[in-house]
Amino acid sequence: MAEHAPRRCCLGWDFSTQQVKVVAVDAELNVFYEESVHFDRDLPEFGTQGGVHVHKDGLTVTSPVLMWVQALDIILEKMKASGFDFSQVLALSGAGQQHGSIYWKAGSQQALTSLSPDLPLHQQLQDCFSISDCPVWMDSSSTTQCRQLEAAMGGAQALSCLTGSRAYERFTGNQIAKIYQQNPEAYSHTERISLVSSFAASLFLGSYSPIDYSDGSGMNLLQIQDKVWSQACLGACAPHLEEKLGPPVPSCSVVGAISSYYVQRYGFPPGCKVVAFTGDNPASLAGMRLEEGDIAVSLGTSDTLFLWLQEPMPALEGHIFCNPVDSQHYMALLCFKNGSLMREKIRDESASRSWSDFSKALQSTEMGNGGNLGFYFDVMEITPEIIGRHRFNTENHKVAAFPGDVEVRALIEGQFMAKRIHAEGLGYRVMSKTKILATGGASHNRDILQVLADVFGAPVYVIDTANSACVGSAYRAFHGLAGGTDVPFSEVVKLAPNPRLAATPSPGASQRRWVGVSTTKLVSASDAQHRGSNLGRRVAGAMVRKCGTMLEDTRVLLKQSSWPKPAANLDIIKTPETLS
């Protein structure tokens, strides 16, 4: 849609897996313009499916760098043709799909600083990359490098404590190590390595943009406490890596003014500022305006938790990043694979394929489900690594089936209890001011949200997050303009639309023994699955040795409740890889 009247604004960009998108947000924080370019549809010459190339091994997944550059050319021309007034843009920021890496060939800095406004970007940058197809977050081909990094750092937990995550194949450090080992010539010809986010910022800046703290946390290279590159991690991945990455910066940093290329070709003002780009997940946290103690729950095909943390406790599951809007705090991500498809299966099996009947089942059963609880993993779960359906009655005995209405509540309570267990395992604590922001398909079901409110003991709000990464990037641009670290982000976005209250905790919800009951039964589920196997013994050992602070906090919670005291085997399930 076009907007012709002068309207001072900031732009928020999102270089995602399947498209490049932009929104314009005015000074009152209203979104008044948006545009996008879809890679498969609008750039078919690159032959991508879902924006990527999946290689023959089924593990290597890449995207053409020039496709992203050409997409930016197209979207800017579309904005120009629509009459968008670039002269009103005060600042811009953006987001990129996390973990992907771009390799700038020696001499590319000169090409960036001398762009001609008479030619599109892709024609001038086509020879600037030492690797034309770059690894993206879907790539899982660097297992060898992951094990090498963990071994060099003294184990997975040691690496997690330092960088916020154990080694993952998609994380950038392991991808860089693979490229160095398998294509040393291309690595030696590389003068700068960017994340997708800092690569996109570099296009606007006309020079190499630094990596920000938050997106840099997804590389297995950044010491998240000190906000500096870990020399040990760098050395374990590739030589001369620090100089190829450049120093990281706070996520709210103004990294410079926009390149004269955009001033001359499109009419941007010379004073338009570029605020450091970050990852799409951190940008979404900004778009949802999470504050200390808040939690966002995305209820989709996979369920994802976004947590605001003050004192993180890195673990072998989940990820901890530097917070994109407050460099003194942190954010965490937890992903659960068995999300909406699992809910739909139980709906079909136990509620006559009807969401209305599903809701009636939740309404007709009591909070706590009479002590009946289930964990449902029809596909191998990520957090924790476990598969199968595991039902327990009030005596903590495993049972084969529940009545339909009990099954429905067992599923929903079990899903949310597992989320709380793992969130608290990373250092999250429910506070008196905690808000839960729910998004995704299941956020439209009030009865599901009521269970969420009861399990966490906090009010649940719903918010439109269709463009959360883009909108969050525009908010971050305003934040950078206002002074960044010297100004609270909440002050900058106070005019943004408020989320809508959807559910409040039922009376007595905060006194229930949610965490203790569910933890005991989740352990029992894993024990039942792995009993008698070496893996089972490893899991049991992990439970005993790795529960730590979370176990103590759980016991304190139980002592404060009026429920029966916990069973002796109250421990925390960790993933089977903990003892690898």
UniProtKB/Swiss-Prot annotation:
SUPFAM superfamilies cross-referenced by the UniProt entry: Actin-like ATPase domain (SSF53067)
Pfam families membership: FGGY_C (PF02782), FGGY_N (PF00370)
Keyword Transit peptide included in the entry's annotation: no
Residues where substrate binds: 99, 170, 280-281
A single GO molecular function term of this UniProt record: ATP binding
Family recorded in the similarity comment: Belongs to the FGGY kinase family.
Gene Ontology CC annotation, any one: cytosol
InterPro entries listed in its UniProt record: ATPase_NBD, Carb_kinase_FGGY, D-XK_euk, FGGY_C, FGGY_N
Keywords annotated in UniProt: ATP-binding, Carbohydrate metabolism, Kinase, Nucleotide-binding, Transferase, Xylose metabolism
Keyword match Chloroplast: no
Binding site for ATP: 355, 441-442, 445
Protein name: Xylulose kinase
EC number: 2.7.1.17
Function: Phosphorylates D-xylulose to produce D-xylulose 5-phosphate, a molecule that may play an important role in the regulation of glucose metabolism and lipogenesis.
GO biological-process terms attached to the record: D-xylose metabolic process; xylulose metabolic process
Recorded catalytic activity of this chain's protein: D-xylulose + ATP = D-xylulose 5-phosphate + ADP + H(+)
Domain of life: Eukaryota
